[in-house]
Amino acid sequence: MKILAIEASSLVASVAIMTDDIITAEYTMNHKITHSQTIMPMIDEIVKRCEADLKELDAIAISGGPGSFTGLRIGSATGKGLAQALNIPIVHVPTLDAMAFNAYGYNGLVCPIMDARRMQVYTGIYKVSKDIDIVQEGCAISIEELINKLNELSDKVLFIGDGIPVFEEYIRENAKFDFDFAPAHLNRQRAASVATLAGIYFSNGEVCSAKEHLPEYLRTSQAERERAERLSGKQE
């Protein structure tokens, strides 16, 4: 089994190749260059360095959201184009699931938090000590609502994601549970985690075609919200 994984849901751009249960290579950047400029060159480079043949791929894994609307569209379009050209399926991997999987083996709750602006986060709650168990499905909620939920669960929590620097002060002031912030090598999206989960899903037959794949946004875009607000104002 050989899978190419693409992660473009945030500022991070990451690609990886997994052969059976080995990550052959991973290329990750966390830098302000648009994914339209980075993803395909990164794929070309990783394929070249690994002396890989794209025709040997069994599937394309895509980090499918939530996250940056532009990034998700670029990741999806890139993956769909490759899958269609190679006539292979796509494995859709929820971004929050893959982020939680970074901390596989953690004894406690894992809580990815992606900054969704307006004091909201894209988040979910997981247990990953052995398998990946979903305690709270991925959603877009206020940081206040998330911390209240975690206070109710009253378990140790590991936070992961770009929401940490945004909401660290709020968490420290309002959390009534023990918590940690993930270290640098775990605290952002990684295509290696997308690939690893994709291998599990692929083995279970959880695939879709290029035509069927759509990102999960979890909420409308800012442009759509602003348009709705303008229309609402006109109606009043």
Q: Where do the protein language model's features map onto the residues?
A:
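Surface "functional belts" at beta-alpha junctions
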Residues: I22, P89-R188, S203, Q222-A223, ...
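Conserved hydrophobic/aromatic positions in well-ordered beta-strands
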Residues: A16, Y122-Y126, E216
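Residues at secondary-structure transition points
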Residues: N30-T38, F69, R73, A77, ...
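DPxDG-like acidic metal-binding loop motif
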Residues: I62-I90, T95
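Acyltransferase
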Residues: D180-E236
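Phosphate-handling active-site elements
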Residues: K48-K55, Q84-P94, E206
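N-terminal beta-alpha supersecondary unit
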Residues: M1-G64, R188
